[in-house]
């Protein structure tokens, strides 16, 4: 390991610590992530020949630019997907589209609401992606829970439920999509064998953390729920909901049919929804006194939390730098050597690691390191691949910045890293380990 590589690791550790201590330093995590990203890539440029053997000096600059653009292009698909999904959910919410979901979940019991929210999130995240599910559920939650100290508990369990629900579905999480696309797992296999472990991984933390909630709910003020829905008819409200939520469900189908990245599907849904709502406002006589629809949508676009987007950019580009200098590969090889090929320990540790760094390069590294075999743990639907799908997905819940769902909730509900680590992480870890144990028992005695 070169001196430059060590410096890059030090920058990552220091930056990560500052992000974790945001509540103490009062420095926005997005600013730290961007500084960390630039510092790592600048260090990389000091002596790039160490990481690009065989590339001549006159071609180094061009090659590095290509590498950075490739990573940025890949990461941008996630960022545009997030921006599109957040805007769609905001539009649906403005038209009162989530009111019937709110009415379905409504109860006076705080703990009763928690179980309903967790169950719905778990189911939705198997169909939608984790980020979209988290955004939708938090928007609904804001209509039900006024107290922010209670709401961040609900939001934290939404993170856990979204990641758990995505782990047993071939389209529920980006890592399971990766494993499914390369043929490491099958849809039937991963659903059949990971459904119970995933359910256990969220059931136990919910059972534990429900005791943080006491008393009855106080409904939010009705005045805070004034939306654009007031100028539209009942069927138009329902049409907006069907187009918005149905469109989100359609995104993975669109991806399967066209092989285009998911963000293209999200942009399609946003474009259709935007066009339809403008037509509704144009046809509505009441809308003429309620403001211009174009202005409304422009305002909604302005509500996208750019600090969350930039935080994503900084973190993912930093991890890309760690990937380029070979740190993730070394970690993977070290794990295999340390745990002597014990798949439960290797994948279990990868899951814990995925709560610190992005799970996508970790899973990509594993796919590259361990080729498919005809039989054994590395066969299709083998123990290693199914455990990897579970651990990389659910393990990201241990720390709030370990998953896209966590980062989104962190930005939307202003949950601090420290608060989550103190109040949620330990319960998430217990659920995570319980899921692994249940998978072992099922694999040993049932399947």
Describe every region a protein language model picked out.
Residues 73-83, 189-205, 258, 262-271, ...:
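Alpha-helical transmembrane segments
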Residues 6-9, 34-35, 79, 114-119, ...:
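Hydrophobic alpha-helical transmembrane segments
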Residues 40-50, 72-73, 124-161, 165, ...:
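Membrane-interfacial helix-loop connectors
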Residues 73, 95, 102-104, 117, ...:
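Transmembrane helical segments that form the transport core of multi-pass membrane transport proteins
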Residues 4-7, 147-152, 168-169, 178-179, ...:
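Juxtamembrane and boundary regions of transmembrane helices in multi-pass small-molecule transporters
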């Amino acid at each position: 390991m070169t001196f430059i590589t060590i410096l890059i690791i030090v920058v990552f550790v220091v930056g990560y610590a500052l992000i974790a201590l945001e509540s103490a330093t009062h420095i926005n995590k997005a600013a730290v992530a961007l500084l960390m990203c630039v510092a790592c890539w600048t260090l990389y440029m000091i002596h790039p020949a160490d990481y690009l053997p065989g590339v001549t000096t006159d071609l180094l600059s061009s090659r590095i630019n290509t590498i950075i653009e490739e990573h940025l292009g890949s990461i941008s698909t996630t960022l545009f997907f997030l921006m599109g999904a957040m805007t769609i959910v905001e539009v649906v919410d403005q038209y009162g589209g989530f009111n019937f979901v709110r009415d379905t979940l409504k109860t006076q019991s705080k703990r009763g609401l928690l179980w309903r929210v967790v169950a719905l999130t778990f189911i939705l995240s198997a169909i939608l992606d984790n980020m979209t599910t988290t955004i939708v559920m938090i928007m609904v939650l804001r209509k039900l829970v006024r107290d922010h100290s209670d709401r961040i508990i609900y939001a934290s369990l939404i993170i856990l439920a979204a990641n758990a629900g995505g782990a047993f579905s071939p389209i529920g999480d980006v890592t399971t999509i990766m494993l499914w696309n390369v043929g490491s797992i099958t849809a039937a296999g991963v659903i059949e064998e990971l459904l119970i472990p995933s359910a256990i991984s969220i059931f136990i933390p919910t059972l534990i953390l429900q005791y943080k909630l006491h008393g009855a709910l106080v409904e939010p003020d009705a005045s805070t729920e004034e939306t654009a829905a007031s100028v539209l008819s009942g069927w138009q409200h329902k049409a907006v909901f069907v187009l918005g939520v149905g469109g989100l469900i359609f995104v993975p189908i669109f991806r399967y049919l066209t092989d285009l990245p998911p963000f293209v599907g999200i942009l399609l849904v946003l474009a259709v929804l935007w066009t339809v709502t403008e037509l509704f406002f144009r046809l509505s006589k009441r809308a003429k006194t309620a403001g211009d629809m174009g202005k409304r949508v422009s305002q909604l676009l302005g509500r996208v939390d750019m600090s969350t987007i930039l935080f994503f950019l900084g973190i993912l580009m930093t991890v890309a730098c760690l990937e380029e200098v070979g740190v993730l590969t070394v970690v993977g090889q070290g794990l295999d050597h340390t745990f002597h090929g014990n798949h439960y320990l290797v994948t279990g540790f990868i899951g814990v690691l995925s709560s610190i760094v992005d799970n996508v390069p970790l899973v990509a590294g594993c796919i590259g390191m361990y080729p498919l075999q005809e039989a054994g743990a590395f066969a299709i639907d083998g123990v290693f691949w199914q455990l990897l799908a579970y651990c990389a997905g659910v393990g990201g819940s241990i720390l709030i910045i370990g998953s896209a769902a966590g980062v989104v909730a962190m930005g939307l509900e202003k949950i601090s890293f420290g608060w989550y680590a103190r109040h949620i992480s330990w319960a998430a870890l217990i659920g995570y380990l319980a899921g692994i144990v249940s998978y072992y028992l099922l694999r040993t005695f049932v399947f």
